[in-house]
Amino acid sequence: MSFKREGDDWSQLNVLKKRRVGDLLASYIPEDEALMLRDGRFACAICPHRPVLDTLAMLTAHRAGKKHLSSLQLFYGKKPPGKGTEQNPRQHNELRREETTAEAPLLTQTRLITQSALHRAPHYNSCCRRKYRPEAPRPSVSRPPLPPPEVEPQGGKISREPEPEAGSQTKESATVSSPAPMSPTRRRALDHYLTLRSSGWIPDGRGRWIKDENVEFDSDEEEPPDLPLD
């Protein structure tokens, strides 16, 4: 029985909404598949043309139609039914109704709530667990270093051979750490290079010295002083 709501009392509207939601749950219709309008009528949220129905009985009759079932399959991304269901849609609908009526009301309500929650939640990717599986057998990789105790008879020869290598390494490190003595001519050339750089001369890459534009010189000489012989 359809009726119109008179006035703009929000408390009355809330009571009406609660009653309509209760009617939807009582007839096993998920809230995502039907919308309740402000005038008390229902609109199908599955069909693309959004049909508006006056009563809950008309909504249930609409949901049993072919157009609604096809749009329901497109909405949930299911494959179309086989030839047997296309030829006998009434039998398919009757079997579907028998399955829903055979279940208890509480079970069907919880099943619908879980289905709506799963559709809203992001899809679970089971491939994430495969990344952690190779890490489980890693402790067994540390077992190969254990076999050396089996080679005990030859261990004496093997353990004695690395000793001179360690001594040679220490000698090489000592020779590398001690720098070679610098000759007097090389020291004079290094001192001359440092004095030229500190006084504002820079090498041009061709073996010549030029003045730095950012440095002020006391004299107008275009050539740097020569390397002292002594």
Swiss-Prot record:
Record keywords: Isopeptide bond, Metal-binding, mRNA processing, mRNA splicing, Nucleus, Phosphoprotein, Spliceosome, Ubl conjugation, Zinc, Zinc-finger
Sequence ranges of Basic and acidic residues compositional bias: 89-100
Positions annotated as zinc finger (Matrin-type): 42-74
Residue(s) of cross-link: Glycyl lysine isopeptide (Lys-Gly) (interchain with G-Cter in SUMO2): 67
Main localisation: nucleus
Amino acid composition bias (Pro residues), ranges on this chain: 142-151
Residue window of motif Bipartite nuclear localization signal: 4-20
Any Gene Ontology CC annotation: nuclear speck
Region (Disordered): 76-106, 129-191
Keyword Ribosomal protein belongs to the record: no
Polar residues bias locations: 167-180
Single Gene Ontology BP annotation: alternative mRNA splicing, via spliceosome
GO-annotated molecular function: zinc ion binding
Annotated stretches, region: Required for interaction with LUC7L2: 188-230
UniProt superkingdom: Eukaryota
Modified-residue entries (Phosphoserine), positions: 2, 183, 219
Intracellular or extracellular location(s): Nucleus, Nucleoplasm; Nucleus speckle
Entry keyword Phosphoprotein: yes
Function: As a component of the minor spliceosome, involved in the splicing of U12-type introns in pre-mRNAs. Plays a role in the regulation of primary cilia length and Hedgehog signaling.
The protein's assembly and partners: Component of the minor spliceosome. Within this complex, interacts with RNF113A, as well as with SF3B1/SF3b155, SF3B2/SF3b145, SF3B3/SF3b130 and CDC5L. May interact with LUC7L2 and SNRNP70.
Name under which the protein is recorded: Sodium channel modifier 1
